[in-house]
Amino acid sequence: MKKGTVINTQLSQVIADMGHFDLLGIGDAGMPVPEDTWKIDLAVSKNLPSFIDVLKNVLSELQVQKVYLAEEIKTENPEQLKQIQQLIDVPIAFIPHDQMKQDLSKTKAFVRTGEMTPYSNILLESGVVF
């Protein structure tokens, strides 16, 4: 049995496959995912698992150099933004939500959580450990 934090097979696989500058999306249950994007669906029920819990676990195993958030999170979900900022110690770029939806087609995968709060979506840009 895997000893690390992330034990979901698909999520572990995509994290291991990430290269420098690759993107991984994590988001709420309502985020529309392009048909050609690999969707790792972790949602069980409303807010289970939460966006923050999944983000914490992914950050424990993935080297991240930059993140992208929807500009709208600043006004529509400031509490979630505050929690994200407490976890992230890399540059944050704010982009329009519509741009984030388009950028999902550039990700290695999108991780769907059970989160039911608006604009709880993030794109993680992979860094290197050296």
Curated annotation (Swiss-Prot):
Pathway: Carbohydrate metabolism; D-ribose degradation; D-ribose 5-phosphate from beta-D-ribopyranose: step 1/2. Coiled coil: none annotated. It is an enzyme of class 5 (isomerase). Substrate binds at D28, H97, Y119, S120, N121. It is found in: Cytoplasm. It holds the Pfam family RbsD_FucU. One of its GO terms (molecular function) is monosaccharide binding. Homodecamer. This is D-ribose pyranase. The lineage of its organism: Bacteria, Bacillati, Bacillota, Bacilli, Lactobacillales.
